[in-house]
C-alpha cells in the first residue's frame, strides 16, 4: 500500500493519511527509507520530484513523526542538492517535534562545512529564525568579511530569499523569532547596505 501511494501523481491518495494515522511507525519507516535513498542518490542542481517533494508539499500530517529522523539525517550528511535541503528543512522547521535548540545546533554545525554562497545563506536563515540576536550579529560580521562587493550583494539577496520566500514554489518554513520590530529593523538596514536598488531583482 505504501509503495502504491508514493507513486501517485500530484501528492498522495486521500486514504494515505488515514493509513499513516492507523500505522504511523510502519508508514514512517517506509517513508524514511525512501527519502534516505532519494538523498543518497541526489544529483546537485537536479530536482528529483519523488517522495521528498510530496512529503514537503502535502504531507504535513506526517511532519512531526518524521522530523526527528530527518534532523538526524541532516546532522550526519552534507547535502549537495539545494532542492533536497530546502525540502528537508521545510519539514524539520515546520514540525513541532524539532526544537529551536535543535535548529541552532544544526545551523551552527552546517555553517562550518558549507562551501557555497547559497548553502551558507540557507544556514544563516535557519539560525536567524530561531536565535536572531546572535545570528544577525554573526551575519553582519560574515557579510563584512566578504571581500567582493558583488559577492556581498549575492549573499545578501540569497539570504533574504531563504529567510522569506524559500526556493522554488514552496514557501519557507523558517521560524519567526526574528519577526520583531527590533530585529526586522536590523535586518532591513543590513540588507540595505549590501543590496543596491539597481541590483535588486
Question: Locations of the language-model features?
Answer:
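Non-catalytic all-alpha helical scaffold/repeat segments
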Residues: 1-201
Amino acid at each position: 500500500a505504501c509503495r502504491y501511494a508514493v507513486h501517485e501523481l500530484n501528492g498522495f491518495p486521500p486514504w494515505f493519511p488515514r493509513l499513516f494515522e492507523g500505522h504511523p511507525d510502519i508508514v514512517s519507516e517506509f517513508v524514511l527509507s525512501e527519502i534516505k535513498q532519494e538523498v543518497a542518490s541526489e544529483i546537485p542542481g537536479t530536482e528529483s520530484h519523488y517522495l521528498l517533494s510530496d512529503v514537503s508539499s502535502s504531507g504535513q500530517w506526517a511532519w512531526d513523526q518524521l522530523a526527528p529522523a530527518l534532523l538526524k539525517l541532516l546532522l550526519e550528511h552534507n547535502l549537495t542538492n539545494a532542492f533536497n535541503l530546502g525540502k528537508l528543512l521545510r519539514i524539520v522547521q515546520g514540525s513541532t517535534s524539532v526544537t529551536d535548540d535543535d535548529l541552532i545546533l544544526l545551523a551552527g554545525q552546517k555553517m562550518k562545512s558549507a562551501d557555497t554562497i547559497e548553502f551558507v545563506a540557507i544556514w544563516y536563515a535557519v539560525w536567524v529564525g530561531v536565535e536572531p540576536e546572535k545570528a544577525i550579529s554573526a551575519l553582519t560580521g560574515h557579510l563584512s568579511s566578504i571581500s567582493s562587493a558583488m559577492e556581498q550583494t549575492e549573499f545578501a539577496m540569497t539570504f533574504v530569499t531563504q529567510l522569506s520566500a524559500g526556493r522554488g514554489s514552496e514557501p519557507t518554513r523558517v521560524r519567526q523569532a526574528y519577526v520583531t520590530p527590533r530585529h526586522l529593523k536590523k535586518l532591513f538596514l543590513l540588507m540595505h547596505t549590501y543590496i543596491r536598488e539597481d541590483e535588486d531583482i
